[in-house]
Amino acid sequence: MAQAQTTTIPPRGFGQTMRPDTWWIQPLLVFIGLSTFIVYSTWAAFQGKNYFFGNYISPFYSPELFGGSPHSWFGPIPGWWPQWLLFSPALLVLWAPGGFRLTCYYYRGAYYKAFWADPPACTVGEPRTSYWGERSFPLIMQNVHRYFLYGALLFILILAYDVWKALWFVDPATGRSSFGIGVGTLVLAINVYLLGGYTIGCHSLRHLIGGFRDQLAKSPGCYRAYACVSCLNRRHMLWAWVSLFWVGFTDLYVRLCAMGIWHDFRIV
């Protein structure tokens, strides 16, 4: 009986591939994009100033639990806060949306490739030869993404309330509020729309409302909700990047208006 011949494929070294395309461009762009956002958002979070302008507040600082602006929920910096410890309202809340993005299924695949080269791209050799997956610490902690989802949904409601407040402008002469729309109002509203599209299209939410394990819900309402989330989920990468850019731009817009560099034009 003839025996089949077997061929052993030697493991690829780091960066080795037979791909003829410029596969390295995408992970490079991801590295640049995420690095830029991380540096800017970290800098902005530690500033602790120029984060509000009239009825506008930066999404990095909302909800402002304690602080010196009119947007503060519970008043100024609490007396029990250590004098030696830097205080910024953003540091009290950014962990929630930051954790949601950090553990996002799409972002995990993106920054594993861009920052850890694990792997750099499909069919491209990676630095290590063994596969560990997300079964050991610290990567097993990525499973908390489903819990960050609840906080992210709550933040969408809070930011939507900020848009509502951005529709009311106070007259400095009389102190009365009147309805209006400024460029900043639109910037904040677009931010909620994009963050909503990214959050509602989340893989965890799709699984949550889809029904039971390995079985779709039979309720027509649940099925329609599942179809809606699935529609957003098909463009989850696009929602992830556009919303990331816009939330950073929203902070920049409010910050530059507060610094007097940009002028907020009233539309209505």
Predicted features and spans:
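Membrane-embedded alpha-helical bundles that constitute the cytochrome b-like, heme-associated redox core
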Residues: 2-268
